[in-house]
């Protein structure tokens, strides 16, 4: 059993926290919405994010970060990408006072715009400078709604430390979620982050009325882009993208109605603006943020990412979806396999 602080009490944070408590761990949820914390504490529900579902009754919620981190052996970050750095800074101040050195696990899937840093890089910079071995990333085909119902899945847990990856594997695994260790930390993170951009594209195709062939082709070429970025910019291992955090996460995120990125793309394909979609989603659409960083990375290293670049233009340069599709299908002929 471990004492675990889960930072972020949205849908995925709540489900992971409840699952970890079911596994026999001592868990506390941290979030900054008082009404959500109150509902979790009084009713063991989180209807703001998850309808018709109850958390493990032994999981309390708090808006006090110092209280949440008290005695924690593991800190699990399940925050929007834009919130990770500031919360990590605040966590470092608290940990410095106590001298505690908990393991940091990230379930956040994104790339920070501006810095173009992965979440593990942010946590290393802000909490454990020059000690990335204390960081573990978990990523794979895992929608909160499905895991909440104890549907079966498998997730990668990656770290530069085999010992820490195995520790997370042991603590997090149960009879419906199987964790596999992986030593390619950056590859696992890139797959989890950039697949959200491709999921928006897949949703756009559905919104425009395209069929299964188009979606399958998009996902396949999208995986090629994810791999290209991961290998060329971050030094990831190509095989990682054939695993749970690559093709596994991409399939579910680009096909499921539980995917907020897919739903956002579908509405854009139907003619709604990005501002409208973000205002009405009620949840974070990470792909809309990640695509900004991907655009900057692709330009900086001259990496060929036509799908991601098209999504950037549609979301932020008011490009016409139909014209972008026409342009993409009319590109110069190329071999299928190339990095």
From Swiss-Prot:
Protein species of origin: Lactobacillus johnsonii (strain CNCM I-12250 / La1 / NCC 533)
UniProt similarity note: Belongs to the NAD-dependent glycerol-3-phosphate dehydrogenase family.
Protein name, entry field: Glycerol-3-phosphate dehydrogenase [NAD(P)+]
Entry binding sites for NADPH: 11-12, 109, 144, 260, 284, 286
Coiled-coil spans in chain: none
Enzyme Commission (EC) number: 1.1.1.94
Broad class of enzyme this protein falls into: oxidoreductase
Functional summary from the UniProt entry: Catalyzes the reduction of the glycolytic intermediate dihydroxyacetone phosphate (DHAP) to sn-glycerol 3-phosphate (G3P), the key precursor for phospholipid synthesis.
GO molecular function: glycerol-3-phosphate dehydrogenase [NAD(P)+] activity; NAD binding
Residue sites binding sn-glycerol 3-phosphate per the record: 109, 140, 142, 195, 249, 259-261
Catalyses which reaction(s): sn-glycerol 3-phosphate + NAD(+) = dihydroxyacetone phosphate + NADH + H(+); sn-glycerol 3-phosphate + NADP(+) = dihydroxyacetone phosphate + NADPH + H(+)
Compartments, as annotated in UniProt: Cytoplasm
One GO cellular component, as annotated: cytosol
Active site: residue positions: 195 (proton acceptor)
Pathway membership, UniProt: Membrane lipid metabolism; glycerophospholipid metabolism
Keywords: Cytoplasm, Lipid biosynthesis, Lipid metabolism, NAD, NADP, Nucleotide-binding, Oxidoreductase, Phospholipid biosynthesis, Phospholipid metabolism
GO annotation (BP), single: glycerol-3-phosphate catabolic process
Pfam families from the UniProt entry: NAD_Gly3P_dh_C, NAD_Gly3P_dh_N
């Amino acid at each position: 059993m471990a004492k675990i602080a889960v930072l972020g009490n949205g849908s995925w944070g709540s489900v992971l926290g409840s699952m970890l408590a079911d596994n026999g761990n001592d868990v506390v949820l941290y979030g900054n919405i008082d009404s959500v914390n109150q509902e979790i504490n009084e009713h063991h529900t989180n209807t703001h994010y998850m309808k018709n579902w109850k958390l493990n009754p032994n999981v309390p919620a708090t808006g006090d970060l110092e209280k949440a981190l008290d005695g924690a052996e593991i800190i699990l970050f399940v925050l929007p990408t834009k919130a990770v750095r500031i919360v990590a800074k605040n966590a470092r101040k608290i940990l410095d006072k106590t001298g505690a050195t908990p393991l940091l696990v990230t379930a956040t899937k994104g790339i920070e715009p501006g810095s173009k840093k992965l979440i593990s890089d942010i946590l290393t910079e802000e909490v454990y400078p020059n000690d990335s071995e204390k960081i573990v990333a978990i990523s794979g085909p895992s929608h909160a709604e499905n895991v909440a119902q104890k549907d079966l899945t498998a997730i990668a847990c990656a770290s530069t430390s085999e010992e820490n990856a195995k520790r997370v594997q042991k603590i997090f695994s149960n009879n419906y979620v199987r964790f596999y260790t992986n030593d390619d930390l950056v590859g696992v993170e890139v797959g989890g982050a950039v697949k959200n951009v491709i999921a928006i594209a897949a949703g756009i195709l559905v919104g425009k009325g395209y069929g299964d062939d188009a979606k399958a082709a998009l996902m396949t070429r999208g995986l090629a882009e994810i791999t290209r970025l991961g290998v060329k910019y971050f030094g990831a291992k190509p095989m990682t993208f054939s695993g749970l955090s690559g093709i596994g996460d991409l399939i579910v995120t680009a096909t499921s109605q539980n995917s907020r990125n897919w739903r956002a793309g579908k509405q854009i394909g139907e003619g709604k603006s990005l501002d409208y979609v973000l205002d009405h989603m009620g949840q974070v659409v990470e792909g809309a943020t990640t695509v900004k960083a991907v655009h900057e990375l692709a330009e900086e290293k001259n990496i060929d990412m036509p799908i991601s670049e098209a999504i950037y233009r549609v979301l932020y340069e008011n490009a016409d979806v139909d014209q972008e599709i026409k342009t993409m299908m009319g590109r110069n002929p190329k071999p299928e396999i190339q990095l």
